[in-house]
Amino acid sequence: MFFHVKARLKLKPRTAILCDNNEELIQTFKAVQKDVDGVIQALQIHKEKHGPEYFREMRTRIFESATERAARLIYLNKTCFNGLYRVNSRGIFNVPMGRYHKPAILDEDGLREASRQLRGVRIMKRDFHKLPALAKRGDFIYLDPPYHPVSSTSYFTSYTRDPFGAKEQSDLSEVYGQLCKAGCLVMLSNSDNPFIEKLYRKLSRRFKDVKIHRVSARRNINSRAERRGHINELVIVNYDTPRR
């Protein structure tokens, strides 16, 4: 969403903030922002050495420099199964290698463009509970939580070692309400799930501007190939959107 807004819509906000609770992701954004040349050089090495044994080594390897940690994360994302990011209870990346003939490990043009779009952006590790303290009236805020499982067999929210279950989803809906009260423009996306819909139907009774939309989105991550493809998602906004 961030890169779409900045690059495709060509918007230039006076202040832009990227927040996530995933330390690895935040450090990767910062490294691409501040040292894209170093990230590219490190990825070139990963590209040359890539193979099953090297991939397994990189899954557990811990680098000291932020640049090397960022390149490792990008390498693993580009070469793991379906580009899935998942960690265990110790915070260790545990996705197996994907079956790609020539994975696109190094996209130099894409990284340089990302670095350009990140100029002047504040990047910080923050739990979503702290968002209201950063927000002010008129701000646009996009919330992209771990999607709530749509079935008992699709339970996956392990983007960090901390759980993100029903309680966290409920807490997030309360934060959404606080942002509404503060006069922010808020968009949230999540799975098309009765539990999530119920949370925001309830919120819409408190804040009349809150609206729930169903949209079709393409998803490529599923253990069963026939279940990959277009699925419905919920997009919840508290402002008017153009009719299509």
Predicted regions and their residues:
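Short, solvent-exposed loop/turn segments at secondary-structure junctions
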Residues: 1, 23-25, 79-81, 129-131, ...
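Conserved S-adenosyl-L-methionine
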Residues: 1-48
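A short acidic (Asp/Glu
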Residues: 3-9, 28, 134-135, 152-155, ...
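Short His-Asn-centered micro-motif
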Residues: 19-20, 124-126, 143, 188-191
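SAM-dependent nucleic-acid methyltransferase catalytic core
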Residues: 33-142, 146-157, 171, 177, ...
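Long, positively charged, glycine-interspersed low-complexity recognition regions
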Residues: 162, 166-244
